[in-house]
């Protein structure tokens, strides 16, 4: 019988590049909580997905020579994309939402219109500082040393017509929500939100943009696209069927029991999100949990900074479950932690190979060696058994107390205390000595049974963290599915007295630290070398007189059009300063849209002989540079006049 519903979400990730270990950390943590709740008997809905609109993606797609939709399709659905990564990491999400999904687009348009009709969204004009990578507007007072307070990068002045959400209207209700003591965790985040955002005064929020087009159109004002706050945040509801016909379980699962988010987006989820839900008259989520960052060399990992760790490489080298375990054992969820390969390998060797792996392999091997794989039913109890039995029997209650409060690290510590005690129990009872005395047969069987029962309980509680390895361990100790339930994790003596074990593979082989670190460094160096730009060979020297024969001048693009029947050529009409328009054809159609080049300032060689291309005359050549197979036009500051000669 279900204990009720439990709806948990990750943030939806921004697919401007491949996802990294930081995204994996959040998703694995959310998956462990979801699996734990399923194990406990809850009806779980686990949602993840991708936030696919915005200026940054539009610009990255343009640089890649593809449409924004093609760009995000590759990052999300392509080889090594988000979906493939979550499949590799054994993520058990029930749904995956993309903000480009039709049902979400239609629902967001309806949501925007409802808030507009209520008067909580109004039209105005925005002027302020904007960070393109974060897609965030900031006031001067919020900047840190003149830079974005979230990512530390440069901001630029932006001014445009926009729609605004009356965030200021909801300042006091949001303050009360934050001070309730249950909505936002860890508690340190509450003080941060109130001190940094509520107390200085909430300003109304820009919720539409006109400076880019890659977004959900405001259907009653098509020049505007819905900005990320409305588009991305409402995914948690649209994915359940809110204002759309795709799903029909909004009433069953909403409100969310917990939104798991990185601490950098706590502000959006604990201030903006509840304010918008209040505007819509919708129930508020029960909790927002802001986890810490995985740091690399003391700094935050970032796709734009390029200092990221590839989870695929780690999973393939060490195993998915070993990586999942490390991420949730090494770092408390609410705090930052430094990622390192040394810590990962050490944790695998110490906890998984030495403690858990050793206990499993030794126990199974002794049952096979001393009893042919099946324990006899006779038993002989000893006081040495009492502490281990008591620890294992009470473990579930302690474990649940931590898991219910997102204490994944401490829950794992408690499990491994019992595993360590079981290894000590082997040394105390010395089964190899008992095996030499036939009269100790019942005592030996009791010792081995106690070890198998301890494994059954501890491995059951490790299921949310290392699902595949736990299933393999159950097969080795002869535990049937009905013996590895949540209820039975609190009961001692569930395995049959005559349990049969099965020899299996070594789940967590030890790793040679020195050798492995050397191989990782070699891989890193090879990857860096492969990514280094390949320079074209240097051409033979020319004299200054030969060079001076090239008449290179600044030109203004008056008109740019595609050439019929050609997928490579664009036809430029240029002002070269002579008073007569000049026509030049250039093979850059794959890399630029014609309309975006009009008005640009480019450089051309003018004194080349006319050349016929697709039946049209080309009088000169535009200068460009090649990088990663893409041609980039050489463009100058617009203040340089047409006809200016390069010197």
What are these model-predicted stretches?
Residues 1-48, 103-107, 151, 157-369, ...:
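Structured secondary-structure scaffolds
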Residues 2-71, 97-112, 117, 134, ...:
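N-terminal catalytic cores of NTP/NDP-binding nucleotidyl/phosphoryl-transfer enzymes
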Residues 71-130:
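A broadly conserved sequence feature marking short terminus-proximal activation segments
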Residues 118-171, 175:
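Cys/His-rich short segments
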Residues 123, 330, 335, 343-381, ...:
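Helix-rich, typically C-terminal accessory recognition domains appended to large enzymatic cores
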Residues 298, 415, 451, 467-469, ...:
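Hydrophobic, well-ordered secondary-structure elements that form the walls
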Residues 473-546:
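Intrinsic disorder at enzyme termini
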Residues 528-647:
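Phosphate-backbone binding interfaces of nucleic-acid-interacting proteins
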